[in-house]
Regions:
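Catalytic machinery of carbohydrate-active enzymes
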Residues: 1-356
């Protein structure tokens, strides 16, 4: 063990020392829910916001969101106040100082692995009680069981992050009514999506094809994208394929569309925000995606879905799609989407088309 890790391990042990405090709630408790992760993380954990507000209508629910998912939090009617997490301590500390003054009854920590910075953050905010999901990964070679700085944890035998998050409600003595994800967006975003889709024949099945996730390892190769487009049309020519893309990517996305597909495959309109993306996904008939954020968003709207995952079964157990109709296609590799079965993607998509 190098000296740097030795210092980190001992520091983590020191800040993890903790006496369990009682959970005491009034009829109008004040909650801080940490959701400063990715878009998909917030969607998967979204049911707890609804269920807490249902059980405690006068609760004051504050959410700490990230820059990438803050719009989802701001549009959620169960959230009373949103605080945006900052990566730099000099920007984060004034926010934490303000949160400390609010004297939260309960903070809820939803990371699936141990993160030292979050432990320090909650030490500074100092809520009366901290509830946390059980951790799948430890830190610096220590197991999650060696690092337990919070008051109460969810059942460690649960695997999927949705179920682990919902177990927070058990700690609060709340019987939840349903497990569905929530994604909210304004009517304007819906009208923009419908206006774009009105350009196409209403009799067509409109498929949303997303080709990349949050990093290059979650990207479908250009050649495979072309094969998927041509393969889908070969098996059913009553379709329109919309290539979902990030703002500014329209030009290179357009170049992926084969010339022979120019009458049925098109780039999407610019989705400048998460709410634009949510609106178009909600308006499409079927989704194909390797991006777990889009996968979980499609699940929130219960859209027929073909999800493409790396062959990493631990992460799949935690983050697999949950909806009425979905198929999962695995890459042959744990760390990339190289060597995915295009025929299987096309065939599973065709099966879902028959349900529409």
């Amino acid at each position: 063990m190098n000296f740097s890790n030795y210092i980190k391990i001992n520091f983590l042990k020191i800040i993890s020392r903790h006496k369990v405090r009682p959970l005491i709630l009034s009829s109008s408790p004040k909650f801080l829910i940490l959701m400063n992760q990715k878009i998909g993380d917030m969607i998967v954990c979204s049911p707890i916001l609804r269920e807490i507000k249902s059980a405690y209508p006068h609760a004051d629910i504050h959410v700490m969101a990230s820059e990438v998912n803050k719009e989802l939090a701001l549009s959620n009617p169960y959230v009373d106040k949103v605080h945006v997490y900052k990566n730099q301590w000099q920007k984060l500390l004034p926010i934490l100082s303000g949160l400390r003054k609010l004297n939260f009854d309960v903070a809820v920590e939803l990371e699936y692995k141990v993160i030292s910075r979050i432990i320090i953050l909650l030490k500074i905010v100092n809520p009366n009680c901290i509830l946390s999901v059980s951790k799948s990964e430890g830190r610096y070679g220590m197991s999650p069981q060696e690092i337990m700085p919070y008051d109460y944890y969810t059942n460690s035998s649960l695997f999927h992050q949705r179920d682990t998050c919902l177990d927070i409600l058990r700690l609060l003595n709340i019987d939840y009514k349903n497990k569905f994800y929530d994604v909210f967006y304004p009517e304007k975003n819906k009208l923009d999506a419908l206006s774009f889709l009105s350009l196409f024949e209403s009799s067509k099945i409109i498929i949303g094809l997303n080709i990349e996730g949050s990093n290059d390892e979650k990207k479908i190769s250009n050649e495979d994208v072309k094969k998927i487009i041509l393969g889908l049309h070969a098996i059913n020519n009553n379709i329109i394929i919309i290539l979902l893309h990030k703002p500014g990517d329209k030009d290179w996305i357009s170049k992926l569309i084969p010339n022979e597909a120019s009458l049925y495959a098109f780039p999407s309109y610019p989705t400048e925000s998460i709410l634009d993306l949510a609106a178009i996904i909600d308006s499409l008939d079927l989704i194909i995606s390797p991006d777990t954020s889009i996968v979980h968003m499609a699940c929130a709207f219960n859209k027929p879905l073909v999800a493409i995952y790396r062959n990493h079964m631990l992460l799949f157990e935690i983050w697999h799609p949950i909806s009425d109709f979905n198929y999962v296609i695995f890459s042959d590799h744990e760390d990339s989407l190289k060597s995915i079965d295009i025929d299987n993607i096309v065939n599973q998509t065709f099966k879902l088309m028959k349900r529409i």
